[in-house]
C-alpha cells in the first residue's frame, strides 16, 4: 500500500542520495534512521536506491534485473511503500530514485 509518510521520507532520502549515493545518510548514519527520526513504527524495512534513469520504467527495469532490489520489491512481508524521484540538474546522475518498504 502506498503510504504518505513513507513517500515523504523517500523524498528526503532521494534528495540525500544526490549528495551521497549510498545507503548511508550524509551524516554517516544508516538510511533507516530517517524512519526512526519520524517515529515510523515497523518490524522490518528495506530501501532501494538508483540513479541516472530518466523514467519510472527504466528504474523499475533496473531494479527488477538486480536480485537484491527485486527481492525487496517482491517480498510479500512488506505492506507499505513510499517511492520518489529527486531531480538535480547539477548532480552527476541528475535523477535519484528511492523506494522505502516497511512491514508495519
Regions found by a protein language model. Give the residues of each.
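Short, surface-exposed glycine/acidic/tryptophan-bearing loops
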Residues: 6-54, 73
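Disulfide-stabilized extracellular recognition modules
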Residues: 51-104
Amino acid at each position: 500500500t502506498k503510504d504518505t509518510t513513507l513517500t515523504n521520507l523517500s523524498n528526503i532520502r532521494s534528495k540525500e542520495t544526490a549528495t551521497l549515493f549510498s545507503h548511508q545518510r550524509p551524516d554517516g548514519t544508516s538510511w533507516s534512521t530517517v524512519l526512526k527520526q519520524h517515529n515510523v513504527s515497523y518490524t522490518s524495512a528495506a530501501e532501494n536506491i538508483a540513479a541516472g534513469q530518466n523514467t519510472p520504467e527504466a528504474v523499475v527495469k533496473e531494479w527488477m534485473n538486480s536480485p537484491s532490489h527485486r527481492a525487496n520489491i517482491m517480498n510479500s512481508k512488506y505492506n507499505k511503500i513510499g517511492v520518489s524521484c529527486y531531480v538535480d540538474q547539477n548532480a552527476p546522475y541528475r535523477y535519484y530514485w528511492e523506494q522505502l518498504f516497511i512491514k508495519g
